[in-house]
Amino acid sequence: MAQVQGKIVQCIGAVVDVEFPRNAMPKVFDALKLDGSALTLEVQQLLGDGVVRTIALGSSDGLRRGLMVSNTGNPITVPVGKATLGRIMDVLGNPIDERGPVDQALTAPIHRKAPAYDELSPSQELLETGIKVIDLISPFAKGGKVGLFGGAGVGKTVNMMELINNIAKGHGGLSVFAGVGERTREGNDFYHEMSDAGVVNQESLNDSKVAMVYGQMNEPPGNRLRVALTGLTMAEAFRDEGKDVLFFVDNIYRYTLAGTEVSALLGRMPSAVGYQPTLAEEMGRLQERITSTKVGSITSIQAVYVPADDLTDPSPATTFAHLDSTVVLSRDIASLGIYPAVDPLDSTSRQLDPQVVGEEHYKVAREVQGTLQRYKELRDIIAILGMDELAPEDKLTVARARKIQRFLSQPFHVAEVFTGAPGKYVSLAETIRGFKMICAGECDHLPEQAFYMVGTIDEAFEKAKKLAA
C-alpha cells in the first residue's frame, strides 16, 4: 500500500502541523517521515480539516511550510532482541555508538497495552543488593519496582551505579538502561564502566548483558518523552522471551518534565505547579507496562529527582503510587558525611513484612527504625539541655542510634576512584547480624567512629582495635 502524503502547514519549535487528505488522516501516535530527511514526527492531536499536530523527534531546524511528509501508518518501531545488546541507541533505535547499524530483524512498536491482569505474576522473592541500609530497611522484590528519590546532588546516580554494579554484574539475566534527560557525561561513563566490567563484550557484542538507550539533556522534548518507552519496549521483548530483566531508568522526573514541555507546546492548559493535566495518566501508561508476567520478570530501578527536596511535588508524588520499594535520599544525612545518604525513617518497602522477609529480619529492621526515631525525638532536648540531662536509658538509646547511623554508611565500589576506600558488598545475613548485635548492646563498648564506612560488624571490631592502638 502506498504511503499517504501530507504537507507541513505550520512549524513552531518542536511542534509541526501537517495537512493530509481528509479521507486518509493518520491516527494519534502514528509516525510520520519527512521526505528526504531522517526526521520523524509523532502525531499528538487531530485538529480537524485534515490537519494533525505532531511533535518532532529530533531538531526541527530547516523545516518550512510545503515540505512533503509520509505517513508510515504505524507507531514508532524500534529494534528489539539480541541485536540491541551491547549497543547504544537513541529514541528511534538508531545506533549512536559508531559501531555500524543495528540489525532490524526483530522490531516492536513503542506504544502497546500493558499486560492483562491475568497475565501478571506477583513475586515475593527478595533481591539482595549488598547495600546494608537498602537490604535491611527497604528490601527489593525480584520483579518489583523501586524508586530512588532525592534532590540535586545527594547521590541518586551513584546509588544507581552501585546497584547496577552489585546486581547487574552478578545477575544472570539481561539489563536495559534508559538514560532519560540526564547528563551525557554520565551516559558515557556508564558505557565505559560496563565495558570494563565485561557486561558490554567488545569482541562479541551479542554476548553482552546490557542494552542502552539514551535521550539526554540536550535532546528535544519529544525525544526525552519517548526514550523511556523505547527502553521499556526492549525490556518487554526480553521479558517475553522468558528472561529476567533489570530495567534502569535515570531519571523518571525528566520523563515528566519532557511531558510538561510537550503539553505546553501543544497548548494544553497546565495543572498544579505547571505540570501537564495528563500527568497521572502518562505516568500510569509507562509504569503499568513495567511489570512481571508468568513468562518472565522485569525488575525496575528508577531514579526520581525531587524538585527543591519537596516529596509532595506532583511529579514524585505521582511516582510513589506505582512503586513497591522507595529509597529516599536525604540532604541532612548527606551533610553528616554518611553515604549512601538513605533516610531509614522515610524509606519503605512492601516486602518488609515478617511473612516475606522472616521474623528476625523484620524485628531487627523495626528495632533499628525505633531507635533512630527515638534519637530524632531526643535531639531537640539534647540541643537545649545537653546529653547530661537525659535519663540513663535515653543516653544508651542515643549512643546506639549514633552507632546505627554510622553503620548504615558503606564504601561503594563505584566511588572507589574518588575515595580510595575499597567498596564493600555485605550479604543480607551479615547485615541482620550486625544490626542485631548493635541493638542488643553487644557493641556498646566500641567507639562510634569504628562503625563509620565499614562493611560487616567484624570490620567494625577490627577498626575499633586500630583506633584503640
Curated annotation (Swiss-Prot):
Gene3D superfamilies: 2.40.10.170, Bovine Mitochondrial F1-atpase, Atp Synthase Beta Chain, Chain D, domain 3 (1.10.1140.10), P-loop containing nucleotide triphosphate hydrolases (3.40.50.300). GO terms for molecular function: ATP binding; ATP hydrolysis activity; proton-transporting ATP synthase activity, rotational mechanism. Keywords: ATP synthesis, ATP-binding, Cell inner membrane, Cell membrane, CF(1), Hydrogen ion transport, Ion transport, Membrane, Nucleotide-binding, Translocase, Transport. ATP binds at G150, G151, A152, G153, V154, G155, K156, T157. It is found in: Cell inner membrane. PROSITE patterns: ATPASE_ALPHA_BETA (PS00152). Belongs to the ATPase alpha/beta chains family. This is ATP synthase subunit beta. It comes from Delftia acidovorans (strain DSM 14801 / SPH-1). The gene is atpD.
